[in-house]
């Protein structure tokens, strides 16, 4: 099937998911510079918050260089055409955080839950719609549910008022056929006017291929990040995805060379380490582990001497999900004790 002429919305993750590899330490000036570049390149939606969403500043998730309010207040006035979104995970972010974001000018709220827990999003989705926001239901770790199970959860979020549903490959575990099955069945089940999106990670180097598969299956919003700046091996690299779309005739409204310049000149220089598919990031995708667990596992390796890869495989075996970051150190300690007993 030709996708020529299909119009999609590209949603930038560099300033939210990109907070994870930066340990939430992006400066206000860096935020402004990158946001202005994205805006000038034609990116229509830019997400700005702590990596774990509004209210994410904590011992469990990490303390950012600045508050969500400061980041949003720095970015929003700089933009000429792009709109700003914010992520909110019920249980981390509250309705008061949502009201704050709305008051500052955020136009899109993405309410994120584990892929089996859409029911916890009802209050936040309902309030967002009442406030007149573009309201997205964001089903994380979607590889852990079958297409039929995702349909049930997506329809719940739609019933609460979400005007867009996201299928989210938080672990970068899916292959194109997995994406096609999930996006296709959810698209068939939702109202025609409800939009559908896909969020990918590059842990198996499938970010671009999976995003194209999502578009072919009916998604019209796609997440990506300049230079792939995001958790694990990064999000779908936007400059590559936009170039592929351009080759295929998919209309993104984003200038290929301008977004490449943003990636090369603004994003790459702020990286603490290259965003690449090393053995630990590959293990995330292979074992189906939440991408933001990567640095937690690397820190546990440095502390306890257990290879991060072994820790990540164990986390995958335990089927840990986002929000269980405190269990990573527990798993490492258990592995240390087991090795001491075996010695």
Swiss-Prot record:
Reaction(s) catalysed by this chain's protein: (S)-4-hydroxy-2-oxopentanoate = acetaldehyde + pyruvate
Binding locations of Mn(2+): 17, 199, 201
The keyword Manganese is annotated on this UniProt entry: yes
Entry keyword annotation includes Manganese: yes
Residues annotated as domain Pyruvate carboxyltransferase: 8-260
Leader peptide range in chain numbering: none
EC category name: lyase
Sites marked Transition state stabilizer: 16
Domain of life: Bacteria
Residues annotated for substrate binding in this entry: 16-17, 170, 199, 290
Active site: 20 (proton acceptor)
Family: Belongs to the 4-hydroxy-2-oxovalerate aldolase family.
Alphabetized HAMAP family for the sequence: HOA (MF_01656)
Name by which UniProt lists this protein: 4-hydroxy-2-oxovalerate aldolase 1
Lineage: Bacteria, Pseudomonadati, Pseudomonadota, Betaproteobacteria, Burkholderiales
């Amino acid at each position: 099937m030709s996708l020529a002429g299909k119009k999609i919305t590209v949603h930038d993750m560099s300033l939210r998911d990109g907070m994870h590899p930066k340990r939430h330490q992006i400066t206000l000036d860096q935020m402004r510079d990158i946001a202005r570049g994205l805006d000038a390149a034609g990116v229509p939606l830019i997400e700005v918050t702590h990596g774990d969403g509004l209210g994410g500043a904590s011992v469990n998730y990490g303390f950012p260089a600045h508050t969500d309010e400061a980041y949003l207040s720095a970015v929003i006035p700089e933009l000429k055409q792009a709109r700003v979104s914010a992520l909110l995970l019920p249980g981390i972010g509250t309705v008061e955080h949502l009201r704050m974001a709305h008051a500052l000018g955020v136009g899109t709220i993405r309410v994120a839950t584990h892929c089996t827990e859409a029911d916890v999003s009802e209050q936040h989705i309902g309030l967002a719609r009442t406030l007149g926001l573009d309201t997205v239901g964001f089903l994380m770790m979607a590889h852990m549910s079958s297409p039929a199970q995702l349909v049930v959860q997506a329809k719940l979020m739609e019933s609460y008022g979400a005007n867009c549903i996201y299928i989210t490959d938080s672990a970068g575990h899916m292959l194109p056929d997995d994406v096609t099955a999930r996006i296709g069945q959810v698209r068939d089940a939702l109202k025609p006017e409800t939009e559908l999106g896909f969020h990918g990670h590059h842990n198996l180097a499938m970010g671009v291929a999976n995003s194209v598969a999502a578009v072919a299956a009916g998604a019209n919003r796609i997440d990506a990040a300049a230079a792939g700046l995001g958790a694990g091996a990064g999000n779908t690299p936007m400059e590559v995805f936009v170039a592929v779309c351009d080759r295929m005739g998919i209309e993104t409204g984003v200038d290929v060379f301008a977004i490449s310049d943003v990636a090369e000149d603004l994003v790459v220089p702020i990286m603490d380490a290259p965003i690449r598919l090393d053995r630990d990031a590959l293990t995330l995708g292979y074992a189906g582990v939440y991408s933001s667990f990567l640095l937690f596992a690397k820190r546990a390796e440095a502390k306890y001497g257990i290879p991060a890869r072994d820790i990540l495989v164990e986390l995958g075996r335990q089927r840990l999900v986002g929000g269980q970051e405190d269990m990573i150190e527990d798993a490492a300690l258990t592995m240390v004790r087991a090795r001491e007993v075996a010695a």
